[in-house]
């Protein structure tokens, strides 16, 4: 029997150096103060809160031609494939107590766009897809990514219930490599 795919069979973590040292140092003391917290490094806290990743599909716009018979025919365009794919993806994260992971990532975004930062890209990001037995089926590497935006944070005084909420980070990447890992 062939099983249906499960949406949670993936592994995506930000690399250890994704949170700059300046930002990590700023939040480490707070994380160590949290009662019952086993996570002391900001990058581990961020990776813990990852809920999902959204990758746009691939779409090619056809070229329309209208021959003399009044019909329209469609053909493949001549634009190189790499220029037709929307090279961006989103990472969804759970909002944690005090919105601390939101503030860490906001500071990270501001760091990457500050004039003092000479590094044009973040480290490559890797997504691993697993099968039902936890075996790696394929890996996707987003090369030379840039953190582009962080979604808005909505606060509301009329709701005082702790509930599951998420926010998203948007990335653009320059190259996408797929590696099949089936032996």
Map each language-model feature to its residues.
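Glycine-rich, low-complexity intrinsically disordered segments
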Residues: 1-183
